[in-house]
């Protein structure tokens, strides 16, 4: 951690972690993500988390700390088994429950500094080449 943040102190750093649920399951990597989430801004470091399993984050202290440290959250379609937990944790209105269960690709709830709105992202034609899976 110290070596990472002290190197090139004047440069912004982005740490992107996809499938982050695999890291939050293990004590050492979960603690690193928590430290980065809590202290990164002070050291010009940004943590970008992607995960299909939000319940892994909500069920651990470190995972909740990572979520709580984020200024921005994007909630896409959720597994129906965890929708109630997500709505409660993020203090969403009751209507969000149905949305989170039925969102289509590109639809999400955006929470920015605790301001919440629904969004739809529609790529322009040339972007499709880069995002098709």
List PLM regions with ranges:
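Conserved P-loop NTPase motor cores
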Residues: 1-99, 125
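Conserved P-loop NTPase motor module
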Residues: 1-9, 100-133
């Amino acid at each position: 951690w110290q070596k990472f943040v002290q190197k090139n102190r004047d440069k912004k750093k982005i740490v992107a972690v996809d499938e982050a649920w695999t890291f939050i399951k293990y004590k050492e990597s979960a603690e690193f993500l928590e430290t980065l989430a809590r202290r990164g801004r002070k050291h010009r470091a940004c943590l970008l988390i992607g995960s299909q399993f939000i319940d892994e984050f909500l069920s651990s202290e470190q995972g909740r700390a990572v979520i709580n440290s984020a200024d921005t959250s994007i909630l896409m379609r959720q597994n129906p088994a965890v929708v109630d937990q997500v709505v409660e944790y993020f203090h969403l209105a009751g209507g969000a429950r149905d949305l989170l269960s039925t969102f289509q690709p590109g639809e999400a709830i955006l929470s920015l500094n605790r301001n919440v709105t629904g969004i739809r992202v529609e790529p322009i034609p040339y972007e499709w080449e880069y995002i098709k899976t």
